[in-house]
């Protein structure tokens, strides 16, 4: 018993302090060795207990170092506090416009007394401010109902306008040609722009028929209708020389 206890004391002094569970297990192992009864077995058991205690102590030491590494250092705590305290509040306009003495503007007591007396006497104070001119109001946009009311009126006006005939308005009905010999001479005193000329299909057709009739007359008689009229008016005038063209001279209509 003494030897076992002696070896157990040596192992306890060389190894790191064990936990409570480790002590219980080591005690049970010592009792088991005592029952078997052998000095060599007890010595081996003591050595094994010493090695196990060393391993447990090393493991506990490494865990403590990891915990210490994870814990924030005092310098890091001071920096975090400094960053949290580094804040500012923007100044108001009154603080920016403070005079050199650092006191805000206040009217003199005499002015305050005068204003209170005016309020007591009249009840209101006149506003002393420059009134700027205002621009005219923006016209309101027309609603859809007003637009719909204006559209039928515009359509009615377009329908009421008379149709102006053009040369491309074809009419299949036969029309009587107008007199081909129209006197274009204007009377003195009348303006040259008294009548507006309009292109009409019936006028174009009448001109075509008139030219065709003149060509047939020239081919049949060899003379123009205008030359016959001039010969009847003045028989003593010399005859015109015939040329190879269909229209020997320029005609005026």
Curated annotation (Swiss-Prot):
Signal peptide limits: none
BP terms from Gene Ontology: DNA recombination; DNA repair; positive regulation of cell cycle G1/S phase transition; positive regulation of intracellular estrogen receptor signaling pathway
Span list, region Disordered: 1-109, 128-253
Record carries keyword Cytoplasm: no
GO molecular function, one term: nuclear estrogen receptor binding
Transmembrane annotation, as ranges: none
UniProt key word rRNA-binding: no
One Pfam match: PAXIP1_C
Keywords: DNA damage, DNA recombination, DNA repair, Nucleus, Phosphoprotein, Transcription, Transcription regulation
Source domain of life: Eukaryota
Modified residues (Phosphothreonine): 138
Residue positions, PTM Phosphoserine: 143, 148, 237
Biased composition (Basic and acidic residues): 51-62, 195-223
Record's subcellular location: Nucleus
Region spans: Sufficient for interaction with ESR1: 161-253
Acidic residues bias (residue ranges): 142-159
Main subcellular location of this protein, as a coarse class: nucleus
One Gene Ontology CC term in the entry: MLL3/4 complex
Region listing for Sufficient for interaction with NCOA1, in residue ranges: 116-160
Free-text function comment from the UniProt entry: Its association with the histone methyltransferase MLL2/MLL3 complex is suggesting a role in epigenetic transcriptional activation. However, in association with PAXIP1/PTIP is proposed to function at least in part independently of the MLL2/MLL3 complex. Proposed to be recruited by PAXIP1 to sites of DNA damage where the PAGR1:PAXIP1 complex is required for cell survival in response to DNA damage independently of the MLL2/MLL3 complex. However, its function in DNA damage has been questioned.
Subunit structure: Component of the KMT2 family MLL2/MLL3 complex, at least composed of the histone methyltransferases KMT2D and/or KMT2C, the common complex subunits ASH2L, RBBP5, WDR5 and DPY30, and the complex type-specific subunits PAXIP1/PTIP, PAGR1, NCOA6 and KDM6A; PAXIP1 is required for the association with the MLL2/MLL3 complex. Forms a constitutive complex with PAXIP1/PTIP independently of the MLL2/MLL3 complex. Interacts with NCOA1, ESR1, NR3C1, AR.
PANTHER family the UniProt entry points to: PAXIP1-ASSOCIATED GLUTAMATE-RICH PROTEIN 1 (PTHR28467:SF1)
Designated name of the protein: PAXIP1-associated glutamate-rich protein 1
Organism (species): Bos taurus (Bovine)
Gene name of this polypeptide: PAGR1
């Amino acid at each position: 018993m003494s030897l076992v206890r002696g070896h157990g004391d040596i192992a306890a002094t060389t190894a790191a302090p064990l936990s409570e569970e480790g002590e219980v297990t080591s005690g049970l192992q010592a009792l088991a060795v005592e029952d078997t009864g052998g000095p060599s077995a007890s010595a081996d058991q003591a050595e094994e207990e010493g090695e196990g205690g060393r391993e447990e102590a090393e493991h506990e030491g490494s865990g403590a170092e990891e915990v210490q590494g994870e814990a924030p250092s005092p310098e890091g705590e001071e920096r975090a506090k400094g960053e949290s305290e580094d804040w500012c509040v923007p100044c108001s306009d009154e603080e920016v416009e403070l005079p050199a003495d650092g006191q805000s503007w206040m009217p003199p007591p005499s002015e305050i007394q005068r204003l209170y007396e005016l309020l007591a006497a009249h009840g209101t104070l006149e506003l002393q401010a420059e009134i700027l001119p205002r621009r005219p109001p923006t016209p309101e946009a027309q609603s859809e109902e007003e637009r719909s009311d204006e559209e039928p009126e515009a359509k009615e006006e377009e329908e009421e306008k008379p149709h102006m005939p053009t040369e491309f308005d074809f009419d299949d009905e036969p029309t009587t040609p107008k007199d081909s010999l129209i006197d274009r001479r204007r009377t003195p005193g009348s303006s040259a722009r008294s009548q507006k000329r309009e292109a009409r299909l019936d006028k174009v057709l009448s001109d075509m028929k008139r030219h065709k009739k003149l060509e047939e007359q020239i081919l049949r008689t060899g003379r123009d209708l205008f030359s016959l009229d001039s010969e009847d008016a003045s028989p003593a005038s010399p005859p015109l020389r015939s040329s190879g063209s269909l229209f020997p001279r320029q005609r005026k209509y």
